[in-house]
Amino acid sequence: MNRLEQLKNSGNKAFVAYVMAGDGGLHRLKEQVQYLQGAGVSAIEIGIPFSDPVADGPTIEAAGNRALKQGVTLQKVLEELQSWTFDIKIPLLVMTYLNPVLKFGIERFTTECRKAGVSGVIIPDLPYEHKQLVQPYMDKENIKLIQLVTLTTTDIRLDEILREAEGFVYAVTIKGITGSRDELSQDVKTFMQKIRKKSPVPVYAGFGISKSSHVDMLRDDVDGFIVGSAIVEAFNAGKIEEIEPLIRAVTTA
């Protein structure tokens, strides 16, 4: 069974933590994953640095640029994951743009992801209409291709995406790029309720989730939360003590 399915069956509110692979050096990724697993996160989304990250806000884009300057590549990240010998009990996700996957080779990418213990892949610039470009290879390796839906997704398109959704639905809470926000729009709550009512898989809210108040606002409307910029900022600033309160806010919801 894919670990994302195990997470769904647990019935707990999920906290998915995002880290940028290679921010501060690729050697830091292992200690970050170990810390987050020990702190109680439900899954970890590992970002692959890319030179044209169209969905990333300033915090994650800056982290990606720092990683690129360290020479971090998709291949190096997958090799790093495959080298780990400690026990990973939670799902690992890879978030990458399409271009690095095409350059690496789609079949090779999914094979190496499986060897690395990856449970799901997020490709934000892969249009839903073209998901068959990678879907057969994902299916072969039992890796879930995670779909994103946004506030601007039409009802017809939303129904199409949800009909074939797997792993979980990545529900974007803002219009625009990733990043921390002070407040979320009230429209978001209605949007999440609509998705959750229709979705056959868990619905996780992401993009802009950075405060306990965001969790409080949506706790009854989603199955989990994805937190990126706030965690990247905390690791970069050496303020990891700021991470655990966010985790507790979700996992005790």
Model-derived segments and spans:
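Glycine/Thr-rich beta-alpha phosphate-binding loop at enzyme active sites
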Residues: 60-62, 70, 148, 158-197
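N-terminal amphipathic alpha-helix/helix-capping segment at the start of soluble metabolic enzymes
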Residues: 1-19, 81-82, 86
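Glycine-rich phosphate-binding active-site loops on the catalytic face of alpha/beta enzymes
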Residues: 43-52, 116-122, 126-130, 171-179, ...
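Catalytic cores of alpha/beta
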Residues: 26-36, 153-164, 205, 209-225
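Catalytic beta/alpha-barrel core
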Residues: 69-71, 117-130, 144-153, 158-159, ...
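Active-site beta->alpha loop and helix N-cap motifs at the rims of alpha/beta catalytic domains
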Residues: 44, 48-50, 61-126
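C-terminal helical cap(s) of enzyme catalytic domains, especially alpha/beta-barrels
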Residues: 56-64, 230-253
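Hydrophobic faces of well-ordered beta-strands that scaffold small-molecule active sites
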Residues: 15-19, 44-46, 92-96, 121-123, ...
